[in-house]
UniProtKB/Swiss-Prot annotation:
GTPase that plays an essential role in the late steps of ribosome biogenesis. One of its GO terms (biological process) is ribosome biogenesis. This is GTPase Der. GTP 2 binds at residues 180-187, 227-231, 292-295. Signal peptide: none annotated. The gene is der. InterPro entries: G_ENGA, GTP-bd, GTPase_Der, KH_dom-like, KH_dom-like_a/b, P-loop_NTPase, Small_GTP-bd. The keyword Repeat applies. It comes from the Bacteria. It comes from Amoebophilus asiaticus (strain 5a2). GO terms for molecular function: GTP binding; ribosome binding. Associates with the 50S ribosomal subunit. GTP 1 binds at residues 9-16, 56-60, 119-122. Residues 350-433 form the KH-like domain.
Amino acid sequence: MANIVAIVGRPNVGKSTLFNRLVEERKAIMASESGTTRDRHYGYATWNGKNFTVVDTGGYVQGSSDIFEKSICEQAKIAIEEASVVLFMVDCQVGITAMDKEVAHILRAADKPVLLVANKADNVDTALMAHEFHALGLGNPYPISAASGTGTGDLLDQVTVYCQDTIEQETDIPKIAILGRPNVGKSSLLNALLGEERSIVTPIAGTTRDAIDTTYNLYGKNFILTDTAGIRKKSKVKEDIEFYSTLRALKALQDADVCIIMIDATLGLEGQDVNLISLAYKYKKGILLLVNKWDLIKKDNHTNAQFKKNIEQELGAHSHIPILFISALHKQRIFQAIEKALEVYTNKTQKISTAALNQTMLPVIERYPPPAVKGKYIKIKYVARLPTHTPVIAFFCNLPQYVQPPYKRYLENQLRKNFNLAGVPVQLVFRKK
């Protein structure tokens, strides 16, 4: 079950500030011209042992004041449909506005948890002013200061009440979600795979397809493919369609075993792509990167290798993710994409024995032991895979607190080199022995 927390409210109430506070990330994931914090509308958060995705609706509202108002109301409706819990933000220093009343009217009619967040309660006087928001009929307001973090702990305690427990479930049939930015070719790939016009590929709002799971068989292997390429009925504003599609995609990401993340070869890897990869990694999903529209790229003998090298450099720590070049339009390598995704699933669910880990990793550690810290030598005695669905490798040693990040990266690289872990998130833990 996906946990989606949507922040709604009129402009300038502090939605983005609260978003940054909850996901605890203040800088862009990729420092390039195409990827800045402007591209980041959703992020991973965890509290009280529960994981959830926070969506900042402010990132989807653009244009004139009339578009603002229409979009805000529309997004409130979408959030009601798709989110686990809605955070409705208001401004203590401004008080109740006509726009607040309009959004509150929509939210009151919803059969969905709504938490009224009274922001900018930076001192006792403004916190007392939060009581006026009782008039909105949405229960007790939560006075907070998103800027300083005051009150956000109590708010998060209540948010997690409405979130499902984070339990990794091992499934018999792999579930694969096709994700990516608008117009990268998700629908074209799905239609090419299925041989039918299952997803709507026109930009016309007024047609609808809900995200659905369907079981398929390829080369004798069953898998579930999640179709996230849907357009919401009656949506008239472009940003609303994007917001709706994003919520659906985020739910699909959380429910999937493997995420196929598609990018456009003519645009390359952009900030939103890296953010999506990072989110999938944090949720411990298998990942495959598809470079679509490869037919539009002028090529020579080195194009493929150079393009792949550039992407791997941009991915940094995620450079182990398999990359496949396809053309959904011309059906080039589309079935290889599913084969590769199933391969990632096999990598993710493989059972690595303790004996194999120790036979492989202890000689590696002996050749290059952990550097001493403060004159103290770290001795790793044995290695074991913990009984989790996604690989968690435990290193038992005398001084686990002194193992430094560069050495952890070295160990992860050696694990990936010696075991089939391409596209798989691997967690390393160090325990006292």
